[in-house]
Curated annotation (Swiss-Prot):
Calcium/phospholipid-binding protein which promotes membrane fusion and is involved in exocytosis. The modification Phosphothreonine is found at residue 7. It comes from the Eukaryota. It is a peripheral membrane protein. The modification Phosphoserine is found at residue 12. It is found in: Zymogen granule membrane. This is Annexin A4. Seems to bind one calcium ion with high affinity. Expressed in pancreas (at protein level). Also detected in liver, spleen, intestine, stomach, kidney, and adrenal glands. GO terms for cellular component: cytoplasm; nucleus; plasma membrane; vesicle membrane; zymogen granule membrane. The gene is ANXA4. Gene3D superfamilies: Annexin (1.10.220.10). Belongs to the annexin family.
Amino acid sequence: MAAKGGTVKPASGFSATEDAQTLRKAMKGLGTDEDAIISVLAPRNTSQRQEIRTAYKSTIGRDLMDDLKSELSGNFERVIVGMITPTVLYDVQELRRAMKGSGTDEGCLIEILASRTPEELRCINQTYQLQYGRSLEDVIRSDTSFMFQRVLVSLSAGGRDEGNFLDDALMRQDAQDLYEAGEKKWGTDEVKFLTVLCSRNRNHLLHVFDEYKRISQKDIEQGIKSETSGSFEDALLAIVKCMRNKSAYFAERLYKSMKGLGTDDNTLIRVMVSRAEIDMMDIRESFKRLYGKSLYSFIKGDTSGDYRKVLLILCGGDD
């Protein structure tokens, strides 16, 4: 199935200077014209939004991020600020938020580290160090423990094989190792799961999953669920899901953020902002297929006001 890509594309007939003037006008004097802010920023892609920030500073002599933060509030502010933050920096800030203060947002750590490409992860590491003067690995080590810590450290290194090569003998060995690591009567050899799932390329892993099913008569997901627990289990399952179908993984993240009472706004905002340009069309398709309703209708029913307006534009339409 061919990937459909993102909902946010570069706007044509784009003028950063004109957009900067429109934004200033929307925030000047009493009150704020939220609709004008949405109409400028939502249809632009990330690099165009960066050009607008530069134009705003050079033509108006003020910082766009500061102005938006002082004029807006709540979840709407968080979406807009996320949209004008460079992509890698946005991930870095989310990782930082997930480990700051008491408590850890394990779901956020898993989502970012399991879904980003090795190249993206290397950029995240460099930016984290520059931004906060500490390595991402250090912070993960001080904030997590045991096998969960080890899987995050392993993922964050961005060392996954990026090729497509399939070594048949190694593939069979990996499947056998995972089977034995889990089916051993005296407990689970978690390191084997970690080694295979964090370092092998996607093509290799998809074959490993098939071979594992052939020898164990169950899906790798079932094996992971019966042999591991807690955040370590969540991380391994996320890796498997991202390898099988990344857009379905994000569809599930969005569904879980909105189903039932209350909304997990952190997850909803992060996925909508970070995937709009990459694979939002594919996420929408997966969402409809998995849950029988459109992502658009879920967002519409779960949010309100300007927050809803901007998320629906990022969503890009109903299905």
